[in-house]
């Protein structure tokens, strides 16, 4: 739970448990750059926020598919978790101490868009004036028909987006150079298929839930196909030859429905060694986000729900202008690992903010167990007012009150 550091760097550097790593800044040569025929000079930053974050090669190279994730995923919660969670998946195979991040450079927006399409029938190819080699959509064929609801059940849109991350390592032969050391892809899968009637494209939106087992089955099949396409790209395009021998990890992310206020989660990942066209065994992520308070929390995580409700009640008792307290917990298995709490309140002076923040910080220590991270964000109509961080086994939380 180090995400908060980047947002409050000036204050967070004082925390011993979250001290960044300072190393000598290196200027190195980047080999096998996908968009360049010649080697490029890049810089490895000397600043690493923590051992949970990758250093990014500089100058920052935007992905040729930059911005697509914003349009293709359902909610801002999913967008944030899909990108940050994919880095968490990468750590299973690529050590942040020795690997350096670069936004994906091999899959451009046209490629991703074509892969997100449905597969077309021969008749549809003729109708759209497309060549057979352009029929690369990973989503299933929709052959048409009058029963739109039945078609939605039988052939929903499973795949919503593909996100690529690249990871570089220093060359074993020459440490003044870095080479591509790994590619990580995230496949964002829909948990609900949204559609309109064919004859009323601007009419009401209908929903077709997709069973978890179906999401996983389809996602694994698509992941295997994507791996083979990456290897083929290396054979077809000399500028992408590095894809032939690089280790590849592909992870499946299940989106939440549009109306939810919690993010989706990664459900599994598989990897292929360099040069292999076959993914290995699938590994379950066993992660889940839970809203507090909620029926799910009450049913499955009663002790945590009770602690949260006691905290919520204390906040309501203390402050008459209270609006709401909402929490989002990240579970790995049955264990709560991280709890983020948002408290939006209208204040009428700095003294109120200070007093309320002190009270909340004290209640965190008294009411919640010590084994998980807690982050409390206190906001008003003016923006962020205070941030409270409590890490496992801390006797005192870190508190920052924003100056406005």
Predicted regions and their residues:
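Sec-dependent signal peptide recognition
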Residues: 2-8
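Bacterial signal peptide processing site
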Residues: 19-22
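C-terminal motif of bacterial Sec signal peptides marking the signal peptidase cleavage site
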Residues: 13-17
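N-proximal, solvent-exposed amphipathic alpha-helical segments enriched in charged/polar residues
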Residues: 33-194, 214-222, 258-331
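Hydrophilic extracytoplasmic domains
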Residues: 292-404
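Extracytoplasmic
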Residues: 178-184, 243-247, 336, 371-373
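Short, non-transmembrane amphipathic alpha-helical segments
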Residues: 211-240, 351-373
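A short interface-forming secondary-structure element
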Residues: 201-217, 339-354
């Amino acid at each position: 739970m180090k995400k908060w550091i980047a947002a409050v760097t000036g204050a967070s550097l004082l925390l011993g448990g979250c001290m960044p790593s300072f190393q000598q800044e290196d200027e190195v040569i980047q080999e096998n750059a996908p968009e360049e025929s010649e080697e490029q000079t890049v810089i490895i930053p000397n600043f690493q926020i923590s051992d949970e974050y990758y250093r990014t090669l500089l100058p920052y190279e935007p992905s040729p598919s930059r911005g697509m994730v914003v349009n293709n995923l359902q909610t801002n919660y999913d967008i944030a978790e899909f990108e940050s969670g994919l880095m968490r998946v990468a750590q299973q195979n690529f050590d942040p101490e020795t690997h350096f991040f670069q936004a994906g450079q091999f899959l451009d927006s046209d490629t991703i868009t074509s892969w997100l399409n449905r597969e077309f029938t021969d008749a549809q190819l003729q109708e759209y004036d497309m060549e057979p080699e352009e029929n690369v959509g990973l989503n299933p064929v929709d052959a048409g028909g009058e029963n739109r609801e039945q078609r939605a059940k039988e052939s929903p849109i499973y795949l919503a987006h593909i996100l690529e991350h690249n990871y570089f390592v220093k060359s074993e032969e020459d440490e003044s150079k870095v080479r591509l050391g790994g590619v990580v892809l995230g496949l964002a899968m829909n948990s609900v298929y949204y559609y309109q009637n064919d004859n009323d494209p601007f009419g009401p939106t209908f929903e077709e839930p997709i069973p978890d087992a179906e999401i996983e089955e389809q996602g694994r099949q698509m992941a295997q196909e994507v791996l083979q396409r990456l290897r083929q790209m290396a054979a077809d395009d000399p500028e992408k030859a590095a894809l032939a021998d690089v280790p590849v990890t592909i992870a499946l992310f299940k989106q939440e429905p549009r109306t939810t206020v919690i993010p989706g989660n990664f459900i599994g990942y598989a990897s292929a060694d360099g040069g292999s066209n076959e993914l290995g065994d699938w590994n379950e992520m066993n992660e889940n986000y839970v809203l507090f308070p909620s029926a799910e929390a009450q049913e499955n995580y009663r002790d945590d729900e009770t602690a949260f409700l006691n905290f919520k009640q204390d906040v309501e008792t203390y402050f008459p202008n209270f609006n709401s307290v909402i929490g989002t917990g990240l579970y790995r298995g049955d264990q709560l690992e991280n709890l983020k709490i948002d408290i939006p309140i209208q204040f009428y002076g700095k003294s109120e903010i200070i007093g309320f923040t002190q009270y909340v910080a004290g209640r965190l220590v008294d009411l919640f167990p010590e084994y998980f991270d807690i982050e409390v964000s206190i906001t008003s109509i003016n923006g962020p007012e205070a941030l409270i961080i409590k890490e496992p086994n801390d006797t005192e939380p870190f508190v920052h009150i924003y100056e406005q």
